[in-house]
Amino acid sequence: MARSVWKGPFVELSLLRKAEDAQEASSNKPIKTWSRRSTILPQFVGLTFNVYNGHKFIPVSVSEEMVGHKLGEFAPTRTFPGHAADKKGKR
């Protein structure tokens, strides 16, 4: 179920402050965050976030198409090794 419109998008307050500081300083330094649940806002466009996936930090460069999505959507937590090969076909 989607979040109520009257509540607005959720963004971690500390992440919002860091993003505003980075915009003012116009620095290219990535913002390190553990907040995968935060929604990407229009003022985040052009910034780079290092999003933690439970193992390491994944760099996420925010573009206009990402606005409205969550940061965690762009840092996968599971690796898919692929389906097992058909053993009969290799003979």
UniProtKB/Swiss-Prot annotation:
It comes from the Bacteria. Keywords: Ribonucleoprotein, Ribosomal protein, RNA-binding, rRNA-binding. GO terms for biological process: ribosomal small subunit assembly; translation. The keyword Mitochondrion does not apply. One of its GO terms (molecular function) is rRNA binding. GO terms for cellular component: cytoplasm; small ribosomal subunit. InterPro entries: Ribosomal_uS19, Ribosomal_uS19_bac-type, Ribosomal_uS19_CS, Ribosomal_uS19_SF. HAMAP family: Ribosomal_uS19. Protein S19 forms a complex with S13 that binds strongly to the 16S ribosomal RNA. NCBIfam families: rpsS_bact. Belongs to the universal ribosomal protein uS19 family. This is Small ribosomal subunit protein uS19. The lineage of its organism: Bacteria, Pseudomonadati, Pseudomonadota, Alphaproteobacteria, Sphingomonadales.
